[in-house]
Amino acid sequence: MGFTQQQEALVNSSWESFKQNPSYSVLFYTIILEKAPAAKGMFSFLKDSAGVVDSPKLQAHAEQVFGMVRDSAIQLQATGEVVLKNGSLGAIHIQKGVVDPHFVVVKEALLKTIKEASGDKWSEELSIAWEVAYDGLATAIKKAMS
């Protein structure tokens, strides 16, 4: 079964909830660094800070990550596949030293952050929609890395 309109709608609505509160970006990176402290150096806006400090660059990067997952949901619903809009994403991830376990950590952080942003709207269906959309994006990035 393909990605449904309902799944796309779930991702879109929770994406809007995420964007409304900048603290979710800090939460996202906090979860990543709790799981993978060594990943701190991969993010230029974090590597020289004592911890996760809110900044315009952090906000922009988090919105970009979550936005790409949202775009993946739209693409999956429309065409059944994810095509990267930014052709350099593979090279950037290679340059930063991203490996498969990093994708798992980011997925977990993304889901925990969306759960927090969604509040009482969180459901298994919402989780699955984000998981499928993220997996589509991760697959496209990994393909671009090979």
Curated annotation (Swiss-Prot):
Species name: Vicia faba
Main location: cytoplasm
GO CC, one annotated term: nucleus
Modification Phosphoserine, positions: 44
Binding positions (O2): 61
InterPro entries: Globin, Globin-like_sf, Globin/Proto, Leghaemoglobin-like, Leghaemoglobin_Fe_BS
Molecular-function GO term, any one: metal ion binding
Positions with a binding annotation for heme b: 44, 93, 96
One Pfam assignment: Globin
Residue ranges occupied by any Globin domain in the UniProt entry: 2-146
Protein name: Leghemoglobin 49
Tissues/organs with expression: Accumulates in root nodules after inoculation by bacteria of the genus Rhizobium.
Modification after translation: Nitrated in effective nodules and particularly in hypoxic conditions; this mechanism may play a protective role in the symbiosis by buffering toxic peroxynitrite NO(2)(-). Nitration level decrease during nodule senescence.
Keyword Phosphoprotein assigned: yes
Function in brief: Leghemoglobin that reversibly binds oxygen O(2) through a pentacoordinated heme iron. In root nodules, facilitates the diffusion of oxygen to the bacteroids while preventing the bacterial nitrogenase from being inactivated by buffering dioxygen, nitric oxide and carbon monoxide, and promoting the formation of reactive oxygen species (ROS, e.g. H(2)O(2)). This role is essential for symbiotic nitrogen fixation (SNF).
Superkingdom to which the source organism belongs: Eukaryota
Modified residues (Nitrated tyrosine): 24, 29, 134
Keywords: Cytoplasm, Heme, Iron, Metal-binding, Nitration, Nitrogen fixation, Nodulation, Nucleus, Oxygen transport, Phosphoprotein, Transport
Localization terms from the record: Cytoplasm, Cytosol; Nucleus
Assembly behavior: Monomer.
Family of this protein: Belongs to the plant globin family.
GO terms, biological process: nodulation; response to abscisic acid
